[in-house]
Structure formats: C-alpha cells, structure tokens
Regions:
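Transmembrane signal-anchor hairpin modules in multi-pass inner-membrane enzymes, especially those
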Residues: 1-50, 55-94, 143-176, 208-218, ...
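Alpha-helical transmembrane segments of multi-pass inner-membrane proteins
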Residues: 10-21, 42-50, 59-76, 83-115, ...
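Interfacial juxtamembrane loops and adjacent helix segments
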Residues: 113-116, 263-302
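Flexible juxtamembrane loops connecting transmembrane helices in multi-pass membrane enzymes
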Residues: 118-119, 196, 200-204, 220-253, ...
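Conserved structural position within tetratricopeptide repeats
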Residues: 426, 456-460, 489-493, 527
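Short coil turns that delineate tetratricopeptide repeat
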Residues: 429-430, 462-463, 496, 530
Length: 560
C-alpha cells in the first residue's frame, strides 16, 4: 500500500538520524536480550521462507522485514535520545481522542468509510478501529488512577520555555485526561468490539490484582457473566472464529515443529475444514477468512513450535522490560496484545508501528544488556541496513505500481488483457484476488489448463472454495468429469454451508444424462440450509426441484 511505501522511504532518514546521533554522541549502543531474540526470530523467519517456499508470501515477508528494520533504526535513535514516556503516551491519547471525535462525527453525519458499519474512524472496520480507542482509554484510566492531583509537569523545551512552564501551573492532569477520555468512552461501546472489552477487563484485573482476594467471588461472577454475554452477543461470529482456529490446528498437526509455511494460514484453514468435514463436524457456521483472529495461533500454524517459542520469548522479554520502563505503556501494549488474541490489529500498519516504537523506546531505556557496540560498529550496521531499506523500498514501489495496474484491468475479460496479467504475475503471485480474476479471464477464453494453473496458485493463498469450483468448471468443460467431481466435492468440504458446489455438480450430472446421480445431488441441494438465503439460492433450489420431479431441469438455469 501507499503507507507501506511511505514507511520504507522513511528508513534512510531514520538511518541518517541514527548515524548523526552515533557520531555526535559517544554513547555505546546496548544490545539487549530482546534485541538478540528478535534477531534470531527474524533469521529463523527468513530461513523458513527461503528453505520452505511452500507458499508465495512476498508481501507478508516484505512487511515483516519493514517492521524489523524500523525496530533497528528506532533502537539506535532512542539510544542517543532522552525522549520521555509522556510524549509516547500523549501521542497515543491524542490519536485515540481524534479517532473518537471522528467516530462521533461519523455517527451523526453517516460518513463512515464502510457502508456496512456506522463508524470506522480512519479505518475500514470497527474492529481495528476500537483498538486505538481501547489503548487511549487504558492510558487515561491508569494515569487517572495513580494521579495525585498535581498539575502537568511540562518538560521545558528549548522553544518558549516560559509559556510551557506557565501552562503547567494552571492545567491539571485530571482535567486534560478526563476531557480526552470523553469521546473515547462515548464511541468505544458503539463499536461492539468484544476484543476491546475483553482486553480492558484483563488489564483491569491485572492492575487491581492486589484487591483480588477480597473481591474474588464478585470478580469471578463478573467474568462468567461477561464471558457469556460477549459470546451470545455475536454467537455466529464467535463460533466462526472457533472453527477457524480448530481447522488451522488440524492442518498444523502434521507440521508441528516448523509449521505449514509462511503465508499458508488461509490454505491451512481450508485444508483443515475439509478434514473436519470428513470427520463429521458441523461446519454450518463457517465462513471464508483472510485473518487468523489470533496472532499467536497464526505464528504457531505458519512457523511451528520453534517460531512460537521465539515469539513468546521476544514478547515476554519486551513486556517485562516495558513494565519497568513505564507501567502505563506496559498496560497499553498488553491490552493490544490481548486484543490480538481475538482480532487482527497487527495486520494494520499503525499498530505495528506503535508496538515497535514502544518496545524500541523501552529497550533503549532499560533493556537487559547482553553486549554493546561502539560508534563505528553502530554506524556500519546502520549503513548496511540503510542499503537494505533502499532495495526494500524499490521492491515495494514496484509491487505498489503493479497493484495500481491490476486495479485498472480488474474484471475485464477481453483476451487482449491476458498478456498484461502475465506481465503482472511475478509481482502479484500472492494476491488471491489477482489470481482468481486471471483464472476467470483465461477460462472465458477457453484456456482451461492455464486457468487451472492460476486457480491452483490462488487456492494456496486463500480459503475461498470458489477456486475449486472454477477448477471443476474447467475440468467439466474439458470432459474430465471425474476431476470435476473431485473439485466440486473439495469445494463443498471446505465450506459445507454453500449450495453452489453441489449445484454445479448436479448440473454436470444432468447434462451428462446421469439422472440417478443428478437426483441424489438434487436431494442434497434441497436438504442443505445455506448460511445466507438469497435469490440465487432460491434459484438453485428451484432447479433441484425440477430435477427431483423428473422434469430434468430442462430450462436454462439463471446461475452458471
């Protein structure tokens, strides 16, 4: 995206800032336990991508490298600066307050960025949007709980120190934080984000643990009531996520130590769904997913126990150090981590930047030293990283341009665009939407084998059963009915609450004159209750009724 490209272009500036700071100040850069574990984890991740190669994962890999480079640059910059935690906390509170005010405006004016949701802030979904409100609330609430009624203690900056000193005498911390909390408190419940509510509850229980024993019965009663309420609030969504987790673990079980491979989570879910369906599990509430809704589960499935162990060591070390550096930021980051156990905040660039910035600041301030490096070594590392970032930005720019070119030709089925799709393929090889559209284009021009080649690649980076349905259509048109039947059955096993795969299989049997199998399939179509009723499902059931009543479904179906 444009934001990823902007971040990559900022790396040389950060590297230059770090180099200047290292040359001007004689401070040595401490290498901490967290630094070491993160570096080992990054090396394992890169090695797993290089040696594995099960899935196309260039986009995910580039984003991960960007996060690691950002951490390295900020670690060096913060090591030579004396930035107070107040600046970070103030920035997060300001961000949350702004998003809260924007949410209020969207509720009043109906200007949400997504037509399905009442409010989304600057995000596309109220889920990630609620995370910034949650962090601002945690910072304000915890600071108010320990505030002693003193005025804000401004650090006198070099510009207008008298002005800032005067403000600190009259503006009280409680007033500022209370005003900042108002839009957050108003908007946060309107997001209906269960992940945010659970995260706030966990942080509150941890912060107030000293009073736990006295109020333990009330606490556990409240936890039980809250858990049941949040589950039944959106039971369908909760059941769907449980199915996603169960299916992904079913696939991971065959690759326990190293995982299925980077970028393979969605395919793991699809394959796991097929396995669970074969075992007779009810998957009527399942849906297509692009996210894991649990960051640790995604790491476990893609990187195995080795990757999860490194992630837990890095995260645990970072949180322990942060707790000593700033208790308020510790609770804020902890709330985001808990939030990521039920949602996907780290799929959004702002939260990756926030997490990296907090950890880099904390490690520079109070990280546990395992070694240290001098100015020359630090400058050398920064120069190497700057060169890597330049190459990274050029690759991201190429992929960003490819995304824009794809947007221009998306949905156009003229044969003249086949060449354009092939030119974009090396840069869009992990884009499921691109591969699906390319497969449709090739199919519309009767290039069935080429179409199936693209659809197979797309199925590796998506959990959508439509890839298998289109492959079945291609096999059917080529006369390979057995392969078509396998593709349709695989599509239904991945998502057994959809009529379309069974409907296509029923039509194939009817067109081939296999009346017996067509009626059997028509019975399955009529007996199945789809997850979402629509005019399309009614049309499919209408064709099935005609076949069942020996009318052979002679009229041409509206849905192909």
């Amino acid at each position: 995206t444009e934001a990823d490209l902007t971040l990559a272009l900022s790396f040389p500036v950060l590297a230059g800032t770090g180099i200047v700071a290292a040359l001007l100040y004689r401070n040595k850069v401490r290498i901490t336990i967290t630094d070491a574990v993160l570096t080992v984890w990054m090396l394992y991740y890169a090695g797993r991508v290089y040696a594995g190669g099960e899935y196309c994962c260039a986009t995910v890999f580039l984003k991960t490298v960007s996060v690691y480079l950002l951490y390295v640059f900020l670690r060096v910059v913060f090591s030579h600066s004396c930035i107070s935690a107040w600046w970070i906390k103030a920035g997060l509170v300001f961000f949350g307050c702004y998003e809260g005010l924007l949410g209020i405006s969207q509720m009043i004016n109906g200007t949400s960025r997504h037509h399905l949701y009442l409010l989304t802030g600057t995000f596309q979904n109220p889920g990630p949007y609620s995370a910034c409100l949650m962090m601002a609330f945690v910072i304000c609430a915890f600071t108010l709980s320990v505030c002693s009624g003193e005025g804000i203690r401004w650090r006198k900056p070099p510009f207008f120190p008298e002005v800032f000193s005067g403000i600190g005498k009259f503006v009280r911390l409680e007033y500022v934080l209370t005003v900042a909390m108002l839009p957050v408190v108003i908007v946060l419940p309107a997001t209906w984000s269960r992940a945010a509510f659970v995260s706030i509850a966990v942080v509150m229980l941890l912060a107030l643990r000293r009073n736990y024993w006295k109020y333990r019965y009330a606490v556990w009663t409240s936890v039980a009531v809250m858990s049941a309420s949040l589950y039944f609030l959106k039971q369908g969504s909760a059941d769907g996520r449980l199915m996603i987790w169960h299916a992904s673990l079913a696939s991971w079980w065959s690759e326990v130590w190293l995982g299925v491979g980077t970028g393979g989570f969605c395919n793991a879910v699809a394959e796991g769904m097929a396995v669970l369906h074969g075992d007779g599990m009810d998957l009527s509430g399942a849906g297509v997913t692009d996210y894991a809704y649990n960051i640790l589960l995604k790491i476990l499935v893609e990187q195995g126990l080795v990757g999860l162990g490194l992630a837990l060591m890095a995260g645990g070390s970072a949180l322990l150090v942060l707790r000593k550096s700033s208790t308020t930021l510790f609770y804020a980051l902890l709330s985001l981590v808990v939030f990521s156990m039920f949602s996907y905040p780290f799929e959004s660039l702002p939260y990756r930047i926030v997490a990296v910035m907090i950890v880099a600041w904390s490690e520079a301030r109070m990280g546990i030293k395992v070694s240290e490096t001098g100015r020359i070594s630090a400058v050398a590392v920064l120069i190497v990283m700057a060169l890597v970032s330049c190459q990274l930005s050029s690759v991201i720019r190429l992929r960003h341009e490819a995304d824009k070119d794809y947007d221009m030709i998306r949905g156009l089925n003229d044969e003249a665009f086949v060449k354009d799709y092939y030119e974009l393929l090396p840069l869009e090889s992990d884009n499921a939407g691109f591969l699906f559209d390319f497969g449709k284009l090739l199919r519309s021009n009767a290039r069935y084998n080429d179409s199936n080649a693209m659809l197979r690649r797309g199925a590796l980076c998506s959990a959508d059963p439509m890839f298998h349905v289109l492959m079945g259509n291609n096999y059917r048109d080529m006369g390979h009915c057995n392969l078509a039947e396998q593709s349709y059955e695989k599509a239904f096993a991945i998502m057994p609450n959809r009529l379309y795969p069974l409907y296509q299989l029923m039509l194939m049997y009817r067109d081939n004159g296999n009346v017996k199998k067509a009626r059997i399939m028509a019975e399955r179509v009529l007996a199945l209750k789809p997850k979402i009723e629509s005019p399309a499902t009614k049309e499919m059931k209408g064709i099935a009724k005609e076949i069942m009543h020996d009318k052979r479904g002679s009229r041409k179906p509206l849905i192909e």
